[in-house]
Amino acid sequence: MEKPDRLQLNEAPWAPFGGKTRGIFRKSLFAVAFPSGFNASLTLAKPGGEFPEHVDSYTHVFYILEGEGEAFVEGQRIPLNSGTALTVLAGKRHGYRNPSPKDLLLITLNIYERP
């Protein structure tokens, strides 16, 4: 019997997101790569952290687990707090930040269009 892939997230290190982000870190939610056009990560925005506005060719779903922040989608400010789910369609300008004094923890789903 094949063993299921298991990832112990509390033991995995946080990786800086990179690029123009500031104070944003992530951990992959999968132990293996999925060829299906989908990935997910646990994302941490430290106090003052920011993912600058940008446009992607894929859809995001952000689900807030803990903390408070704010997203910007096509110029509209959207408050983020625990329990919020926000979908940003491909091609829409978006970004988010954590202006609060506490960590903002979210699940980020990236859904790529299949050819």
What label would you give each PLM region?
Residues 26, 40-56, 90:
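Conserved short histidine dyad/triad with adjacent acidic residue
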Residues 34, 90-115:
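Ligand-binding loop in jelly-roll beta-barrel domains
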Residues 51-53, 71-72, 88, 94-100:
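Short beta-strand His + acidic residue motifs that chelate non-heme Fe in jelly-roll/DSBH
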